[in-house]
Regions:
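NAD(P)-dinucleotide binding in Rossmann-like oxidoreductases
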Residues: 25-29, 39-119
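A general secondary-structure boundary signal
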Residues: 10-13, 32, 73-77, 122
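Rossmann-like dinucleotide-binding domain that binds NAD(P)(H)
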Residues: 1-58, 138-141
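C-terminal helix-rich "cap/oligomerization" subdomain common to oxidoreductases
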Residues: 40, 118-153
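Active-site rim elements
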Residues: 22, 107-111, 129-133
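Generic structural signal for secondary-structure transition and capping sites
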Residues: 10-14, 42, 68, 132, ...
Length: 153
């Protein structure tokens, strides 16, 4: 999730880590991860926890700007009802581009797809020299530093 924020918004001016322990079943480790990323023109946040009942159904990416909003929710969903990493996924996209703040927007659904299919195809293309990896070493290094700050390091 942090890589999505970074790829969309760029380098944050400030990172505020807000991770904590839910205390569920006596857990003392930080199992609720959250960070706020402050920018000159806005704020982004990323949150993840395995203890939120029904949370998988609400996995989402929302991008809000002055010209509209795009929401992917659920971010990926098990279209066959199985709970495994390789079952087909679907994504719903809602777009609203209007001055009307109450507009519900247009809804689109992705075709079924494997959760990692695109990533593995792209990786194979990079390894075989078909495509150039768009993520340079410096990008990966900066992302790693941002991730560490988001974790409170």
């Amino acid at each position: 999730m942090v890589d999505l924020v970074y790829s969309i918004m760029g380098d944050p001016e400030e990172i505020i880590p807000l991770s904590c322990s839910s205390g569920l079943d006596g857990t003392t480790a930080e199992d609720f991860g959250m960070a706020v990323f402050k920018y000159k023109n806005g704020v982004s946040f990323a949150k993840s926890t395995a203890v939120e009942i029904g949370g998988f159904e609400r996995r989402q990416l929302v991008v809000v700007g002055t010209k509209g909003t795009v929401e992917l929710c659920p971010f990926e969903w098990l279209s066959n009802g199985r709970n495994d990493d390789f079952s087909p996924q679907i994504t719903e996209v809602r777009e609203a581009f209007s001055g009307n703040w109450h507009q519900k927007g247009e809804r689109h659904f992705s075709p079924e797809h494997g959760r990692y299919d695109g990533m593995f195809r792209a990786f194979a293309d990079y390894v075989n020299g078909v495509k150039t990896n768009p993520y340079a070493y410096e990008y990966e290094r900066k992302l790693h530093k941002i991730l560490l700050k988001a974790c409170g390091e």
